[in-house]
């Protein structure tokens, strides 16, 4: 199956996007600031990819995660880091909830000028195939 390319639209003036859902991965809201949200159509329940790195925390529900060529389960408390352009899909048979942060900092972005961020390159390199942390720590 061919993955759908999702075009992530950052809110004006923002360097990353924060998403939240409380029932369905199709019914998502973008958090714009304190008390401000905007509805967006989520693609999490389709096989898709985007150029942004994504960090997703599941706060409720459970299901099956498809990330690249790996298939596994997810449940509340799980954290998943997805590298750029990594195809993924979350399948649930009931309600789920969670938060996602999506960002894209190309090589030329000023964030890489900070010395403390250089070590993040190794983390993002490992996330090219996805990283999954299970449950509460």
Which role does the model predict for each range below?
Residues 1-66, 72:
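Generic protein-terminus/edge-of-domain signal
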């Amino acid at each position: 199956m061919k993955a759908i390319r999702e075009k992530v639209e950052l809110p004006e003036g923002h360097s990353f996007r924060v998403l939240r859902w409380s029932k369905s991965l199709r019914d998502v809201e973008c958090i714009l600031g304190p008390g401000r949200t905007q509805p967006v159509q989520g693609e999490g329940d389709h096989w898709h990819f985007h150029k942004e790195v994504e960090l997703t925390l599941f706060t409720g529900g459970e299901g099956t995660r498809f990330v690249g060529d790996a298939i596994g389960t997810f449940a509340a408390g799980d954290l998943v880091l997805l590298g750029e352009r990594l195809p993924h899909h979350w399948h649930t048979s009931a309600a789920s909830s969670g938060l996602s942060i999506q960002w894209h900092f190309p090589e030329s972005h000023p964030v890489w000028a900070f010395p403390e961020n250089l070590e993040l390159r190794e983390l993002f390199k490992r996330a090219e195939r996805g990283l999954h942390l299970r449950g509460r720590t």
